[in-house]
């Protein structure tokens, strides 16, 4: 059961995040409306998510397939889009395609093939982002920058996939200067990708920035920031959605 104190905390947190987002956008000479707030709701209950859906949150991001299934089935997002932002295994693609408005974490041609097949079966075109391992960390998913353009070309060749942009998570141990540099690299990669005019592509999404660095991401061109802890508080991994 979500308490009144939790509700107040969430409402105040989202209001503060919105203020910070608007200030960061204006400082960068951008329209605040260009940037959407994605609530990263991994481990959050259906009740928590349903309440937060009434706040000025634009969309929701799920890291786990089962949580996406449970929350979409329960209409926890209250009509707002749900995105898949975690590592997607090929054997779970069928549960995500058609449920997620956007799959943000595509990083292989094998995954592209599975998504394309599943989307064709449903008679739809699935929007995706390509995830870049911008810090070239062995422990993280995503393609390196050198492999990006061949993967974009492969995505553009799939009839039931539409490229929408790029996603990244900088290294957690990067300092503020390094993080800004990674975000700037992402902005430059998106511009280069957009200039190639891939078939069916609409390269207008740059998903980067989380609770601790979303203002810096906005300064460098993010159009989606993924914020979890700053909205819901510290995660309790013993809870199930």
Q: Which residue ranges define each predicted feature?
A:
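Conserved alpha/beta-domain cores
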Residues: 1-212, 220, 232
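Gly/Pro- and small hydrophobic-enriched strand-loop and loop-to-helix capping segments
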Residues: 222-240
């Amino acid at each position: 059961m979500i308490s009144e104190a939790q509700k107040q905390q969430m409402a105040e947190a989202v209001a503060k995040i919105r203020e910070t987002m608007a200030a960061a956008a204006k400082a960068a000479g951008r329209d605040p409306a260009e940037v959407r707030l994605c609530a990263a709701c991994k481990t959050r209950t259906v009740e928590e998510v349903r309440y937060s859906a009434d706040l000025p949150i634009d969309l929701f991001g799920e890291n786990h397939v089962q949580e996406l299934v449970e929350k979409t089935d329960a209409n926890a997002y209250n009509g707002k889009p749900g995105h898949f932002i975690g590592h997607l295994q090929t054997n779970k693609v069928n549960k995500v395609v058609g449920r997620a408005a956007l799959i943000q974490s595509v990083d292989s041609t094998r995954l592209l093939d599975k998504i394309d097949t599943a989307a064709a079966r449903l008679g739809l075109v699935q929007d995706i982002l390509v995830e870049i391992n911008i810090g070239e960390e062995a422990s993280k998913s995503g393609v390196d920058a050198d492999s990006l353009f061949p993967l974009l070309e492969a995505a553009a060749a799939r009839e039931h996939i539409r490229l929408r942009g790029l996603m990244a998570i900088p290294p957690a141990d990067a300092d503020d200067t390094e993080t800004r540099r990674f975000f700037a690299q992402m902005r430059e990669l998106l511009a280069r990708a957009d200039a190639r005019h891939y078939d069916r592509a609409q390269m207008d999404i740059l998903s980067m920035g989380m609770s601790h660095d979303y203002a810096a991401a906005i300064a460098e061109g993010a159009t989606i920031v993924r914020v979890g802890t700053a909205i819901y508080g510290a995660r309790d991994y013993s809870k199930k959605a």
